[in-house]
């Protein structure tokens, strides 16, 4: 059986990257929430 996590840097960036987050309103809310929480890393 194939495992569910098949790492790919490109897919990771496209799905969870900063620009992907900024592209939608809800994504911007995620970035804002992580900024308010004081996260070192805002996105993948």
Swiss-Prot record:
InterPro entries: Ribosomal_bL34, Ribosomal_bL34_CS. Transmembrane segments: none annotated. GO terms for molecular function: structural constituent of ribosome. Keywords: Ribonucleoprotein, Ribosomal protein. One of its GO terms (biological process) is translation. It comes from the Bacteria. Pfam families: Ribosomal_L34 (PF00468). GO terms for cellular component: ribonucleoprotein complex; ribosome. Belongs to the bacterial ribosomal protein bL34 family. HAMAP family: Ribosomal_bL34. This is Large ribosomal subunit protein bL34. It comes from Xanthobacter autotrophicus (strain ATCC BAA-1158 / Py2).
């Amino acid at each position: 059986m194939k495992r569910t996590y098949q790492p790919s840097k490109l897919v990771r960036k496209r799905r969870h990257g900063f620009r992907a987050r900024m592209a939608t309103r809800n994504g911007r809310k995620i970035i804002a929430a992580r900024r308010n929480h004081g996260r070192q890393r805002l996105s993948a």
